[in-house]
UniProtKB/Swiss-Prot annotation:
Gene Ontology cellular component annotations, sorted alphabetically: cytoplasm
Predominant location category: cytoplasm
Organism from which the protein derives: Streptococcus suis (strain 05ZYH33)
Gene Ontology BP, a term: fatty acid biosynthetic process
Record protein name field: Holo-[acyl-carrier-protein] synthase
Catalytic class of the enzyme: transferase
Pfam families: ACPS
Family named by the database record: Belongs to the P-Pant transferase superfamily. AcpS family.
Classification of source organism: Bacteria, Bacillati, Bacillota, Bacilli, Lactobacillales
Domain of life: Bacteria
Length: 119
C-alpha cells in the first residue's frame, strides 16, 4: 500500500548560487559516498547531480510528512545502479521507496513514492 508521495521542483540556479557562496555546501547535502560520485563529475553534470540529490531528499522528506529539518540530508543516501537509475540506500523509512529524478533546462524535479513492505 502507498503511504506517501512527495514531489520537489528546484531551480538549478539556486543550487549553483549556494554552491558558489558556500564552498562546503555540497558536503552539507551529500553523504560521503554521494560526495565521491559528485567529485568524479564535472561541469554541468556535477551541478545536475547535486541539484538532483537536493530535490530527491526534499521529495522524500515531503513524502514522509516531515520536510527537511526533522530529518537531515545525511540521513538519506541516494546512489545509482550501473545503468544510472537512482535508488535510496539509506533513509528513516523502512518500506519500498520509488524515486525518479528529471532534469530539464534550468530545473530539476524529483518524485518519491513510499510503499509499505508486503508481509
Amino acid at each position: 500500500m502507498i503511504v506517501g508521495h512527495g514531489i520537489d521542483l528546484q531551480e538549478m540556479e539556486a543550487i549553483e548560487s549556494a554552491r558558489i557562496k558556500h564552498q562546503g555546501f555540497p558536503k552539507k547535502i551529500l553523504t560521503e559516498k554521494e560526495f565521491e560520485r559528485y567529485q568524479s563529475l564535472s561541469g554541468r553534470r556535477q551541478l545536475e547531480y547535486l541539484a538532483g540529490r537536493w530535490s530527491a531528499k526534499e521529495a522524500l522528506t515531503k513524502a514522509l510528512g516531515t520536510g527537511i529539518g526533522k530529518i537531515g540530508f545525511h540521513d538519506i543516501e541516494i546512489l545509482n545502479t550501473s545503468k544510472g537509475v537512482p535508488y535510496v540506500t539509506k533513509s528513516p523509512f523502512d518500506g519500498n521507496i520509488w524515486l525518479s529524478i528529471s532534469h530539464s533546462g534550468n530545473f530539476v524535479q524529483a518524485s518519491v513514492i513510499l510503499e509499505e513492505k508486503d508481509d
